Amino acid sequence: MGPEVELPAPPSAEESTKQKAAYDASSQRLEDLIRAQNPGAGAPPPVTFEALVQQFYISAMIQMGAGTQEGQRPRVDILGARNTIDLLAILAEKTKGNLTDSEDRMLQSVLFDVRMAFLELTSMINMQAMQPPVPPPPGKK
């Protein structure tokens, strides 16, 4: 690792409390505005640990080409997928012992699923890389 970077002092408890109150008020005004524009819209889903894990899962799967429309070529970001999977692993490591059984099972299942998808994708990429190049049709170079 490189040299330690000196970080600024964290905000005081009072500053954090004021900032959180302002954030909550601003979020509520935004929600009220959206509901006024679209009265039939339901409330957004609650922000939970499961929603956070699901967000990482969806990101990793999309980065590995899932959700591609039929007939379109998948857009794969294998390095981005690996980074997202590594973030999930860090989340699992840093929250170990602090999750409910349900949260832990979900996180472990998601990690298993995205790692398996990653292994399948990298296996396919390796197989393609090992195949000899297709020669051009006669008369083309």
Predicted segments, located by residue:
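Long, contiguous alpha-helical segments
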Residues: 22-141
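N-terminal intrinsically disordered, low-complexity tails
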Residues: 1-23
